[in-house]
């Protein structure tokens, strides 16, 4: 049952990216990005990453709502263009959906998905050796590594997000 849920969430994830790539108006593009972010958090949650899914949902989608709230307020259109108002945009959306459908049918026909990345074992994922303690949580080690080894990464990421918001606000404000 969980495999089907992940498969359906993956299809919704890719279809939402097709909808974003053929966006006719920034309002709908932001909405589709928010939906795809929420579905991506659901996929992470289904694989057991409860903390990571929650953090991505709060930080990424919170930032997305703020950025698209500002840009939508500054660059609002009286009659926004939808997917069916232009034949070229509708054609791009339908072609993207058909290619996703064909890919899904190809995967279901072969009943297997090849893994691109191969790891020798659990040792490639583990940062600290826990000995013979049995069960351990990977999330706690990832959070510890992020805030101990990745302090500069957190600072640079926060600074680039702030710069991105300021650039987007300046571009959409115009003259």
Swiss-Prot record:
Keywords noted in UniProt: Electron transport, Membrane, Mitochondrion, Mitochondrion inner membrane, NAD, Respiratory chain, Translocase, Transmembrane, Transmembrane helix, Transport, Ubiquinone
Domain of life from the UniProt record: Eukaryota
Cell compartment(s), UniProt: Mitochondrion inner membrane
Lipid bilayer topology: Multi-pass membrane protein
Family recorded in the similarity comment: Belongs to the complex I subunit 6 family.
Claim: Transmembrane is one of the keywords in the record: yes
Complex formation: Core subunit of respiratory chain NADH dehydrogenase (Complex I) which is composed of 45 different subunits.
Membrane spanning residue stretches: 1-21, 25-45, 47-67, 88-108, 149-169
Predominant location category: mitochondrion
Gene: MT-ND6
Organism placement in taxonomy: Eukaryota, Metazoa, Chordata, Craniata, Vertebrata
InterPro entries to which the protein is assigned, alphabetical: ComplexI_Subunit6 (IPR050269), NADH_UbQ/plastoQ_OxRdtase_su6 (IPR001457), Nuo/plastoQ_OxRdtase_6_NuoJ (IPR042106)
Record function comment: Core subunit of the mitochondrial membrane respiratory chain NADH dehydrogenase (Complex I) which catalyzes electron transfer from NADH through the respiratory chain, using ubiquinone as an electron acceptor. Essential for the catalytic activity and assembly of complex I.
Stored Pfam families: Oxidored_q3
Catalytic activity reported: a ubiquinone + NADH + 5 H(+)(in) = a ubiquinol + NAD(+) + 4 H(+)(out)
Uppermost EC category: translocase
BP GO terms, sorted: mitochondrial electron transport, NADH to ubiquinone; mitochondrial respiratory chain complex I assembly
Example GO molecular function: NADH dehydrogenase (ubiquinone) activity
GO cellular component: mitochondrial inner membrane
Protein name: NADH-ubiquinone oxidoreductase chain 6
EC number assigned by the record: 7.1.1.2
């Amino acid at each position: 049952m969980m495999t089907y849920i992940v498969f359906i969430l993956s299809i919704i994830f890719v279809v939402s990216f097709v909808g974003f790539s053929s966006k006719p108006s920034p309002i709908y593009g932001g909405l589709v990005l928010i939906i795809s972010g929420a579905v991506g958090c659901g996929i992470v949650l289904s694989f057991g990453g409860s903390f990571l899914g929650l953090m991505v949902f709060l930080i990424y989608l919170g930032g997305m709502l703020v950025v698209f709230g500002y840009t939508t307020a500054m660059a609002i259109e009286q009659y926004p263009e939808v997917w069916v108002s232009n034949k070229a945009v509708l054609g791009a959306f339908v072609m993207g959906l058909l290619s996703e459908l064909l890919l899904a049918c190809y995967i279901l026909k072969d009943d297997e998905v090849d893994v691109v990345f191969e790891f020798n074992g659990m040792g490639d994922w583990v940062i600290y050796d826990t000995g013979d303690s049995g069960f351990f949580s990977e999330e706690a080690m990832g959070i510890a590594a992020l805030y101990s080894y990745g302090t500069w990464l957190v600072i640079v990421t926060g600074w680039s997000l702030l710069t991105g918001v300021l650039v987007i606000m300046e571009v959409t404000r115009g003259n």
